[in-house]
Amino acid sequence: MDPRKVSELRAFVKMCRQDPSVLHTEEMRFLREWVESMGGKVPPATHKAKSEENTKEEKRDKTTEDNIKTEEPSSEESDLEIDNEGVIEADTDAPQEMGDENAEITEAMMDEANEKKGAAIDALNDGELQKAIDLFTDAIKLNPRLAILYAKRASVFVKLQKPNAAIRDCDRAIEINPDSAQPYKWRGKAHRLLGHWEEAARDLALACKLDYDEDASAMLREVQPRAQKIAEHRRKYERKREEREIKERIERVKKAREEHEKAQREEEARRQSGSQFGSFPGGFPGGMPGNFPGGMPGMGGAMPGMAGMPGLNEILSDPEVLAAMQDPEVMVAFQDVAQNPSNMSKYQNNPKVMNLISKLSAKFGGHS
């Protein structure tokens, strides 16, 4: 398994231990069902932790969208302009009461909750929004497992322009009944107030799919173009980034190949130099002119006409030649003569130099 995936899984498990409410989101429903099917038990979510997680998620979404708008400002792909008319500042009120989902509910409590619900709807129709909130909260505390109560209270929070509170209620309603259209509708409207265009479009589209609503459809038509613009911008940005990464990868491969080929050429040059000059210190600069005693015809300059020359192995097999080649004084004199044969007269009285020249002349002369 990919080590990165294992690391991500380990981090996810750690997060779940710290905040079990992560497992109670709709996205994690499949994981809860699997854990329970294996005989495990998913710990109950704390509403405080859940609310904090929702707030963090909203901040992450907003940060992601802001990053898309601000990253690489010099690039054409960062030029994203969105009409944010109607977007408001996020509410920061303390999380609302959600009731005890593990409480034992009696029929009397359910009846009383229905009465509170009816009174809340009447208050809502009369424009008494805060009173409606209070009555819906009373109903929720009496029957905390009824999804419609959270959805109704969320609708009032939207009217009060408290989108984060509305989102918390909708999240809870969806956990209880993910097939109800109302929570998606009001959560979509709350996201629209926050400028979360993609989230708003997803929720409103799902609400219309579950139970078509003209009001939700009208808002979907408003937010969808902006959501599509953001999605297209993201795809364009990711495509540019992928192209840039591919280009950089190609450049790295090209550079590595060039360095490898350069190293091969240098190695080949060293190998050829070694085979040409063997162990001769300093080589034979300027070639070996044909003015050695005994004659070395055709060997001026770059040493043409070498078909009759003895091999270096044969020359170096002579111990006296090899010893002379290791003598710095002899090699300096030899190179001096090789570059300018007329300088040989300077070494007429040097037996070591003349001995080497005589031996080489004899060897080359014998193979001419």
Curated annotation (Swiss-Prot):
Location of the protein in the cell: Cytoplasm
Q: Where is this region: Disordered?
A: 38-81, 256-299
Indicate where the modification Phosphoserine is found in the sequence.
S345
Q: Show the InterPro entries listed in the entry.
A: Hip_N, STI1/HOP_DP, STI1_HS-bd, TPR-like_helical_dom_sf, TPR_rpt
- Main location group: cytoplasm
Gene3D superfamilies, alphabetized:
1.10.260.100, 6.10.250.3420, Tetratricopeptide repeat domain (1.25.40.10)
Query: Which cysteines bridge via disulfide bonds?
Result: none
Name any GO cellular component annotation: protein-containing complex
Keyword annotations of the record? Acetylation, Chaperone, Cytoplasm, Phosphoprotein, Repeat, TPR repeat
- All copies of domain STI1, residue ranges: 318-357
A GO molecular-function descriptor = protein dimerization activity
- Biased-composition ranges for Gly residues? 280-299
- Pfam families, alphabetized: HipN, STI1-HOP_DP, TPR_8
N6-acetyllysine found at:
K352, K359
Compositionally biased intervals (Basic and acidic residues): 49-72, 256-271
Positions of the TPR repeats? 113-146, 147-180, 181-214
Gene Ontology BP terms:
chaperone cofactor-dependent protein refolding; negative regulation of protein refolding; response to bacterium
Family membership noted in the UniProt record: Belongs to the FAM10 family.
Q: What does this protein do?
A: One HIP oligomer binds the ATPase domains of at least two HSC70 molecules dependent on activation of the HSC70 ATPase by HSP40. Stabilizes the ADP state of HSC70 that has a high affinity for substrate protein. Through its own chaperone activity, it may contribute to the interaction of HSC70 with various target proteins.
Quaternary data: Homotetramer. Interacts with HSC70 as well as DNAJ homologs and HSP90. Interacts (via the C-terminus 302- 318 AA) with GRK5.
Q: Which PANTHER family match?
A: HSC70-INTERACTING PROTEIN
* Protein name in the entry: Hsc70-interacting protein
Q: Which organism is it from?
A: Rattus norvegicus (Rat)
Q: Which gene encodes it?
A: St13
